[in-house]
């Protein structure tokens, strides 16, 4: 398993332990990708997982740029069109600065 897949697996376990149900992983469409898709009660949660091994370029949080947010929104729109409904939704981030389940930061509404 590569580091990205390991980070996504850690994030999925972390979110599940906080009550979210993972309903999709690595959803891809032309122009975008969503790492994890989850449900928290009736809210669809699109999760970007970011892993950084050091803070040389600002850490995991700084790596979510405006361009990355646009790609997430594009992929989410595609996903919603595919499922044919518009539930309440939000965009979260799971930030890991190492492959350490004790050091995961969950940011809602990025």
Over which residues does each language-model region extend?
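Hydrophobic "anchor" residues on beta-strands that sit immediately upstream
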Residues: 21, 44, 88
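Aromatic- and charge-enriched substrate-recognition/interaction segments
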Residues: 67
């Amino acid at each position: 398993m590569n580091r990205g897949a390991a980070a996504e697996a850690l994030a999925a376990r972390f979110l599940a332990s906080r009550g979210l149900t993972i309903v999709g992983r690595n959803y891809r469409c032309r122009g975008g990708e969503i790492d994890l898709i989850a449900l928290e009660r009736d809210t669809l949660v699109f999760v970007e997982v970011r892993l950084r091994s050091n803070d040389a370029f600002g850490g995991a949080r700084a790596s979510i740029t405006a361009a990355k947010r646009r790609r997430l929104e594009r992929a989410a729109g595609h996903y919603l069109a595919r499922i044919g409904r518009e539930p309440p939704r939000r965009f979260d981030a799971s930030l890991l600065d190492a492959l350490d389940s004790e050091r995961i930061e969950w940011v809602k509404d990025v």
